[in-house]
């Protein structure tokens, strides 16, 4: 977990979490264990909002009383009174609800929040929760408990609240939120992604004091990426007279986590526009099938979409957009397999980058390894990579250490997208192998490692240098591409008329459709050639001759292409030394059993490759000229894959046989000595 100077670690949040979960003892027996989180979380958020409003409570109530009968819209007046974009006009608070009419008073208290704050509790179905607590006789006690803890942002920062929430999720897992693992991005990963995204624009921020830029996270969860990015630029005040301003936007699928993010944004203000309600830009819904920011673009994007999650629930809308809008929509390049929608978010972010003429856009997205290489040439995954690379949108990919996520130990990768690359990065992708940049921490779920401040700084410096080194490669994007060619070889086959062939003929559908009388005519003709070996082209003249002979005898039989194919299937025997089979036009017939494929680097001519790599071993091989790419119409289908091992592989020579032999003899001696001791006892 990131532990910057302005941030408490997750462990520092434990005293608060211990207090909150002491409330579970008051719930035990009346509520299921699985309900605890859904009860406690909204109370946590309520108390946090209450702590912020407490200093101006009397001023707001007095102002509301003075203006409510005037008929004017007093919303702006009350916001100015609180110095925040929300307010509450009730005289109640958690500490003065009373023990006799607690439920009615609490419901009245919630109802007097401004609309943008009240929606938070609606998403938790808080009204029903209050009724259940009241019936169980514990509502007053829970309210009193929370009234005694200070959750003001000056006491408990946004990061600690986010860490706290995620700690509680890990403690109760899916019982609190079935999609919990989808949004829990460790703070160290968030901070690294933010630094890589924003630091390249230092010069822009320095030359434009107070520059306003938009920020977007399509999978915003509790808002960790958004708040961290905003805090990151706020720290620029140490260097710049007026730091830049990021205006956050986000979308979240899960109502509960959306509510947490709403709370976080309600409590944040922009120095340039203190009354602005940042929570209005945090939307609820599925980003893939219900984009709440359609046709909008952003200067900066951050995202950690779920790993390996099916997108079948969104498939109808996504497929329709792909087919109807094509490249005018988000998913024009292609669609991945249904079992992993992470590449759809990659395309979604690319579509959200601000246009270069408006300052351009940059994005950072955390993905598993699958989007690097899943899918062969012409597959949806490969076509997505192709579009991103050929349009020069991929600036860098960072391989992160394993075991840095809470719910998985798999390898993860941080992609940096940009449509405003500087000259040294054009047409190139920087690969950074940061798998060794970590320090050990106390286990938190599957998380055993962290990218600390020093390691983060090293990675950012490596990225900024944009040079080749032991852990960095600047790669021409075409090096990731290949052209998959279909390699054919001639069919070399003789026709051997024997009992084995006759038995196989019985299984051919064309034979089975014949009448018994016609079958007998063909059998009589074939038996005249029993034991003979013929060229492959013999079948057609034989059939024609048999048809004529039957006709002369007053019998009408037919021998079309299907029947001749049945004869060659039944009696054909491959003959490596035979002549290639030719079709009616004199063209070589390919042997389907010898068909093979070769992936030829895009930077190489396919015929040169064939001559060097294939023909020395298979002199009769040739390229199928009809196997073409759908887009460029050239022979061979284009594919792209990004294989880190190819660029960072280190050869480790095997140990010398003498060393291995000596070690084995030593072990044998030790075993013999142990056995001798046992024998003497």
Enumerate the language-model features and the residues they cover.
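Short, exposed "boundary/linker" segments that immediately precede the start
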Residues: 1-7
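Non-catalytic, mostly N-terminal accessory regions of nucleic-acid modification and defense proteins
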Residues: 9, 13-202, 269, 276-287, ...
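Conserved Class I SAM-dependent methyltransferase catalytic core
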Residues: 20, 32, 36, 40-48, ...
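Short, contiguous acidic/charged loop-to-helix segments that flank catalytic cores in large enzymes
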Residues: 30, 312-340, 370-380, 401-407, ...
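Short, well-ordered loop/turn and helix-capping segments at boundaries between secondary-structure elements
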Residues: 45, 51, 55, 267, ...
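Short acidic (Asp/Glu) and glycine-rich catalytic loops that position anionic groups and cofactors
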Residues: 144, 240-243, 276-283, 323-329, ...
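Conserved S-adenosyl-L-methionine
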Residues: 179, 183-303, 308-319, 343, ...
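Flexible, glycine-/basic-rich loop-and-beta segments that form/coincide
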Residues: 406-504
